[in-house]
Amino acid sequence: MSERPEHGSHTLRIYSKPGCHLCEIMIEELLPLIRGRLDLEVVDIESRPDWMQDYGTRIPVLEFNAETVCEAKLDVTAIQRIIAQHTSS
């Protein structure tokens, strides 16, 4: 796979592209869960041909610390686990 952009230790990254309905749904469901706890970086896969090749048929792909958390549908349990392990409340 191609090189991933740098991100902070409390940042989720979603690989997406404009007009991706599943991506929009995942972001909409994710934001209330992470607000004030984790950051979200939206990566447009159309900005690089290698990302289009790697993620084009898999989006949305959600990653944390360069590990895939879920694809296509939000895994709420996985997000709750990440929040519990990586944030202080």
Regions found by a protein language model. Give the residues of each.
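Local sequence-structure signature of Cys/Sec-based thiol-disulfide redox active-site neighborhoods
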Residues: 2-32
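Generic recognition of short, well-ordered alpha-helical segments
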Residues: 25-28, 53-54, 74
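Short, well-ordered coil/turn elements that cap or connect secondary structure elements
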Residues: 35-37, 56
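Structural micro-motif
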Residues: 56-62
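Non-catalytic, surface beta->alpha helical segment in thiol-disulfide oxidoreductase systems
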Residues: 65-89
